Amino acid sequence: MKANPFNELEKSEKIRKPESMRSYMTIEEVQALIDTPMPHEEYEIVKCAYLFSCFCGLRISDIIKLKWNDVFVDRGQYRLAVSMKKTKEPIYLPLSPEALKWMPERGGKSSEDNVFDLPSANTIRMQLKPWAKAAGISKRFSYHTSRHTFATMMLTLGADLYTVSKLLGHADVKMTQVYAKIINKKRTRL
């Protein structure tokens, strides 16, 4: 075959990939989660890690490996120095006062200790659904929803796409544009 026959098709004739559906929490739903205790008190750390991610955008894989020596203060601003597990890209993430509220106290932990002492990934998943249900949330809910929530909240509150892309550690702004489309659809419905 000398040439790809699909190159001859008009754009309107090509099969379009469906847009990815990203589930995220509204500000009201995040508040409901804040107000709702975990069904099992010993898993309150799962709630803290989830809400921390809602306010900083880290993936669960990055929160699990987050150490106290990754947290530092630069000119009065708390930051994280994180090498993203998925992209291997190092980022320096500023922490908002809201994100800091959900970080556990360091106490006597060493700089090599994990910030969040989390149970297994399976246990985390099992604890999230009953917590969301208790908060009155019936939509699709996973740990990654917290990352989507961060992105949509940042864009809703006026952050530019490039900044949100950098905060999420995306290699390409195109990956972040999915969230901008969500915000635009949300605005047109209002």
Language-model regions: role of each:
Residues 1-3, 58, 108, 137, ...:
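Helix N-cap/coil-helix junction residues
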Residues 4-60, 64, 86, 110:
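Basic, Lys/Arg- and aromatic-enriched nucleic-acid-binding interface segment
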